[in-house]
Amino acid sequence: MRRRRRRDGFYLAPDFRHREAEDMAGVFDIDLDQPEDAGSEDELEEGGQLNESMDHGGVGPYELGMEHCEKFEISETSVNRGPEKIRPECFELLRVLGKGGYGKVFQVRKVTGANTGKIFAMKVLKKAMIVRNAKDTAHTKAERNILEEVKHPFIVDLIYAFQTGGKLYLILEYLSGGELFMQLEREGIFMEDTACFYLAEISMALGHLHQKGIIYRDLKPENIMLNHQGHVKLTDFGLCKESIHDGTVTHTFCGTIEYMAPEILMRSGHNRAVDWWSLGALMYDMLTGAPPFTGENRKKTIDKILKCKLNLPPYLTQEARDLLKKLLKRNAASRLGAGPGDAGEVQAHPFFRHINWEELLARKVEPPFKPLLQSEEDVSQFDSKFTRQTPVDSPDDSTLSESANQVFLGFTYVAPSVLESVKEKFSFEPKIRSPRRFIGSPRTPVSPVKFSPGDFWGRGASASTANPQTPVEYPMETSGIEQMDVTVSGEASAPLPIRQPNSGPYKKQAFPMISKRPEHLRMNL
């Protein structure tokens, strides 16, 4: 699992924050504007009535007898009934889900306050490692901000974000289905109807990001997770680009080489159309066992992406071949999805003719694979290399300078859904106490290096290979980029292995399973 400037502390949605202030003011109203000559409580008859109107629209007299009063102990818990302060101690570490150079991902259980007992994924990042260079700082900035802004059925949910002196914590929904990558490793290749389901859900997630002015730029099997039902969830938003709308381009060189669009490699400026190229590369990977263009090293892979013809296996249906050719066009302007219709253009293709988009968005379409899970805490779909380890969050003994810590101001976040549950649980509905008023691969990741420190925390058919025929070559649409002279390096590196189809009966067995691709590239924190 990879993945606004405001005062640090608990974030309250504006409507809740104001309402809570009014509620608390009502609870502790002591009527300081009462006239000095008003009668004291001693002058009232025992068990008598208060005969003045209470400004409740003519509400009548209130009985002051003890039978109408509620006794409660004054304590921090009973007085401070708003959202709790989230800190590492609020979570019990259960398993290690992944590790990276900058931190770990744990499976955790919340043990205090709202969501007590619920399972989450906790991503822990070391501040000292992040602030070393602008690239990693920008990665963290983008992920944190986008996760707060974007809410969609096919995008991972951020529940909490908080920090200590030396670490950043992102509490995400736990996706017990694991990575789509592991499903591909298990199956080798997908049937077309299976690929169609996943591609359809992914296209809806990409379309939602594009509506928000966000380009994803790192679509690959490792960044696609499955929930407990088998539905898709996009994760890892570190390479996203924000505020990109129609007519706007960006020039940052980033992504994972095998899935990168030619215009990114050419540094000629790119827009949201790069995500549709990546969807085509992912579709090719699902249906054939490897991305469309791979080489012995990065330079050879780039050379193939820019110049080579697209080879399509003969077993693909006409609809699949046509969609691949339209998504993998080197001329970005003529690529399917590049027009004003964006995701709608892709979804209207005959390859998706059997998809009911409304039911898909509502997650009423049954996924082709449902994880076989024993409990909510099941980690069988994750690599046992990590899950076997003892979960330990190392002591937070590092200290950053005050200027370095300024970078992380406003990092704290609480999901609106949590605030809503707090509002429901701690509603300030008045009980009659007294007459007072009461008033939410070798994959090759390339990260962006440009960073501005200002405004940091802003806002079918079977895929059988029984008939081995020579793949058919289809000439790809040419453009100026194919004339580029790419120097091929003599550096040696292992080629991307091609998955072989699993010809045996499908077994819904739990992992562990050893990936055929280098482990150090499977977890990017």
Curated annotation (Swiss-Prot):
The modification N6-acetyllysine is found at residue 516. The active site is at residue 218. It catalyses: L-seryl-[protein] + ATP = O-phospho-L-seryl-[protein] + ADP + H(+); L-threonyl-[protein] + ATP = O-phospho-L-threonyl-[protein] + ADP + H(+). One of its GO terms (biological process) is long-chain fatty acid import into cell. It is an enzyme of class 2 (transferase). Phosphorylation at Thr-412 is regulated by mTORC1. The phosphorylation at this site is maintained by an agonist-dependent autophosphorylation mechanism. Activated by phosphorylation at Thr-252 by PDPK1. Dephosphorylation by PPP1CC at Thr-412 in mitochondrion. This is Ribosomal protein S6 kinase beta-1. It comes from Mus musculus. The lineage of its organism: Eukaryota, Metazoa, Chordata, Craniata, Vertebrata. The gene is Rps6kb1.
